[in-house]
């Protein structure tokens, strides 16, 4: 049985389709077509548990965001045959802008010579160098900055070491990769730049920004494995790439306590 047929049959199950219609309404058929196509065309998702992949796609749909890794908003990454929900830096920016409370929002790398110190409240002072010289300089860290419509501004900066320490603390796969040097399932190994930008943006918004319900849901769901009970409509959530789910909860609590 082909992957497309398998997913198509799974989604056309009466109980599954009824649940989808209760959530998506008139968007149901388009959703089924898109997810079936994704499952058939993606080699890295072909062995993923169907329920977890569906739950990831539904999470993106609930936020009205495209579920496609090529667009950089929301997608799924396999972890031991389970689809884990991934959110890009673009999604955090998109959800923030929807609140109407953000005037500017950005995250980028910081090159050697650009970080010159901190001001009297501890915010980083960054002096950007010329674009034609910049690519020649090594990346020493990442920053994220925002300005709200009420005039509040905040910038945060993490060094490369601080970002790696964060990844090592919360990702089993990245720890294994650093220990063995072998290929890993974690995006921290294959897409460090994107993960660093997203991590800084996520930290900035969760600690200092204004968060809508969708933004809170996005932060909670990022890197999670989701499961749906079609009988009750309940959604369960786990964080398989953390050593324990308690570590993920600890990370979320740290964001609250530091805000």
Residue map of PLM features:
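Binding-interface segments
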Residues: 3-211
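Glycine- and charge-rich intrinsically disordered segments
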Residues: 1-18, 215-259
């Amino acid at each position: 049985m082909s992957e497309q047929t398998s997913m198509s049959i799974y989604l056309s199950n009466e109980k599954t389709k009824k649940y989808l219609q209760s959530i998506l309404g008139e968007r149901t058929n388009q959703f089924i077509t898109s997810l079936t196509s994704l499952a058939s065309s993606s080699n890295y998702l072909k062995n993923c548990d169907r329920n977890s992949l569906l739950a990831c796609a539904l999470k993106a749909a609930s936020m009205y965001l495209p579920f496609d890794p090529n667009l950089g908003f929301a997608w799924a990454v396999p972890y031991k045959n389970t689809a884990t929900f991934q959110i890009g830096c673009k999604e955090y920016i998109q959800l923030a802008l929807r609140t109407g409370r953000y005037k500017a929002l950005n995250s980028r790398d910081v090159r050697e010579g650009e970080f010159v110190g901190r001001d009297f409240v501890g915010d980083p002072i960054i002096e950007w160098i010329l674009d034609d010289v910049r690519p020649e300089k090594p990346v020493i860290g990442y920053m994220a900055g925002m300005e709200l419509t009420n005039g509040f501004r905040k910038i945060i900066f993490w060094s490369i070491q601080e970002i790696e320490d964060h990844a090592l603390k919360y990702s089993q796969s990245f720890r294994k990769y650093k220990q063995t040097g072998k290929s890993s399932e974690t995006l921290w190994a294959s897409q460090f730049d994107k993960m660093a930008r997203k991590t800084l943006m996520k930290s900035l918004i969760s600690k200092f920004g204004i968060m809508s319900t969708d933004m809170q849901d996005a932060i909670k769901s990022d890197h999670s494995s989701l499961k749906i009970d079609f009988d009750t409509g309940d959604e369960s959530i786990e964080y398989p790439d953390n050593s324990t789910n308690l570590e993920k909860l600890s990370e979320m609590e740290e964001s609250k306590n530091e805000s």
